[in-house]
Amino acid sequence: KITSNSPDHESLKKLRVELEKIPGLAVVSTVPTDIEITSINAQKGSSLLDYAKKDGLKPEEIIAIGDSENDYSMLSIPGIHSVAMENACDMIRNICVYQTRANTRDGIAYIINCILADRENFKL
């Protein structure tokens, strides 16, 4: 992964447009002042699916939690239980099935506790 940071948002937008033209690259931002460049085969989604396959897990048996663009490939896997943090960007909130508290309010612990408290209704 290559990360570039700059306070110049316009330059980063132009760089992103050019990088997105290169086949095989995934280009995302986690905040307006950065850009992340990876191979499309090194994204969280493909890594999670590889791990699941090795362990014999189906997407329906997986919970994934995220808040920014670099989580998109993981949270958009069909069938997965996708959870957006309260502080997630709109792109992530719009694709997730569930939402939890913000990362500053123990959002991951909160969603895990909710699942454990209601196991009968939350089938994995």
Go through each PLM region and give its residues.
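Conserved acidic, metal-coordinating active-site core of Asp-based
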Residues: K1-I65, E69-I77
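Asp-based, Mg2+/Mn2+-dependent phosphohydrolase catalytic module
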Residues: S82-L124
